[in-house]
Amino acid sequence: MDPFATGGGMLQTEDQWYIFYHRQTNRSSYARQACAEKLERRSDGGFQQAEITSCGLNQGALKGIGTYEARIACNLWSINGTGRYDGKSPKQKLKDHPYFTQSGKDRENNGDQYIANMKNGAVAGFKYFEMGEANQIGITIQGNVMGTMQVSDKSDFENICAEIEVNGSGKEMHTYKGALNIPSGKRALFFRFQGEGTVDFHSFELMKD
């Protein structure tokens, strides 16, 4: 596999196989971010289809305590669903959709990628975390916003695990915190903005008080 290509490929390291692929950033089909997922073998020697997660080359679920950058989200959609960047005028057509970007130009180091343009009803999903200790959650965002960031372990938000009030303006980073009530075990985390304005979502922290 060419390690510099993001078109996709399989790699074996010791006894474990991984699939490498890419996804689009900056609302362009020409801006690409390399990603990887762990593969599981079937009894016939083939591979099960890999689920897209936030775990990458990590050996299992991420720790349920710590700070994580929003750029590791594996699900991202607006109140109107998802879209494709390979059509005509994608930036205009998808102007109400969230997207991955960074400050400044693309670069090989000192990255600060984040999720931009989260409007009312937009969702960012992260899979998976080994929960059990955290009972507080914080989010670091910027933007002119007023509303609530809801957190759930379900993509349909049937179970609300946290509601964090947000009220900020300008380009300053703001951190907001709230109580977290989530079942123990391997869990996903979905963040949904409900309110006015546009959120740039930079990171979140899982904490124990």
Placement of each model-derived feature along the sequence:
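Carbohydrate-active catalytic/glycan-binding domains of CAZyme proteins
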Residues: 1-209
